């Protein structure tokens, strides 16, 4: 059966490069100051979506993300791997959202997209590690949900068969469509970008990224509509501004500290019995061991 699949994806700060400017004064992530990447577990989810597309002729895969205009980059990265379209939720009213406000915005967008069979995303994002957004989206849409998925084995007769991780092993479950699925980072890694698709979509942009008239390639967007990515505001998805962004986020970060572990002093030991015995005695005296 042909499936309409939406992949929930997030552009996240690269946590390997967190510096002193990582947070704003309001306690939110300063995304402009940090390198941005495609959330790793969302790539695992994208791979599952693309496999389903291959197994079910006529299926489509779309990338849904929320963020500033530069977040359109992860839609392009999805297109380079085989996705068909994408939607970027971008509006200052979306800014500063916690998981509750984020799931509300994504759910309203999914309603606007309409007739979705499978919503699939990573288990959690590396900038929050809450694993809340997927289940909250399912709850707001009133859909079945399967979390901690390793693989979507098949979709047949209106049901998805999914292998998921549980304590002490794995289980295989069957869920009626439509369904929301969250995927673990231990699932199959996402395929690499396809050179032909990179050439096809490298100039795909949302309207806020569009080059000014008269600049090179600006005429491409009339000639090739597929290069224009969908860009939606709060109003476009009929969202309630009181449930979006900071206004709709009951979670408040009171303070954040950057903790750096540093050794105050170091000692060089040899492999001699005397050095080893001396170190053990010192650790015992300092109550570090024993």
Where are these regions (language model features)?
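N-terminal glycine-rich FAD/FM-binding segment characteristic of electron-transfer flavoproteins
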Residues: 1-290
């Amino acid at each position: 059966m042909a499936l309409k699949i939406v992949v929930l994806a997030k552009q996240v700060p690269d946590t390997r490069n967190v510096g002193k400017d990582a947070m704003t004064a309001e306690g939110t992530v300063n995304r402009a100051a940090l390198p941005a990447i495609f959330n790793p577990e969302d790539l695992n989810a994208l791979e599952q979506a693309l496999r389903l597309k291959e197994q079910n002729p006529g299926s489509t895969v779309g990338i849904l993300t929320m963020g500033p205009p530069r977040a359109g980059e992860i839609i392009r990265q999805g297109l380079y791997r085989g996705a068909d379209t994408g939607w970027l939720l971008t509006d200052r009213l979306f800014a500063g959202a916690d998981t509750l406000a984020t799931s509300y915005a994504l759910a309203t967008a999914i309603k606007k997209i309409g007739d979705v069979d499978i919503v699939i995303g990573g288990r959690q994002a590396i900038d929050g590690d809450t694993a809340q957004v997927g289940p909250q989206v399912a709850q707001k849409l009133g859909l079945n949900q399967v979390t901690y998925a390793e693989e979507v084995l098949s979709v047949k007769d209106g049901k998805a068969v999914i292998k998921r991780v549980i304590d002490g092993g794995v289980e295989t479950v069957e869920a009626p469509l439509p369904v929301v699925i969250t995927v673990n980072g231990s699932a199959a890694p996402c395929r690499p970008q396809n050179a032909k698709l990179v050439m096809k979509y490298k100039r795909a942009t949302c309207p806020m990224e569009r080059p000014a008239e008269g600049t090179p390639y600006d005429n491409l967007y009339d000639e090739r509509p597929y290069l224009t990515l969908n860009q939606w505001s709060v109003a476009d998805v009929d969202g309630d501004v009181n449930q979006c962004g900071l206004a709709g986020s009951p979670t408040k970060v009171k303070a954040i500290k950057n903790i750096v572990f540093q050794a105050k002093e170091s000692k060089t030991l040899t492999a001699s019995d005397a050095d080893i015995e001396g170190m053990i005695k010192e650790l015992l005296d300092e109550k570090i061991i024993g």
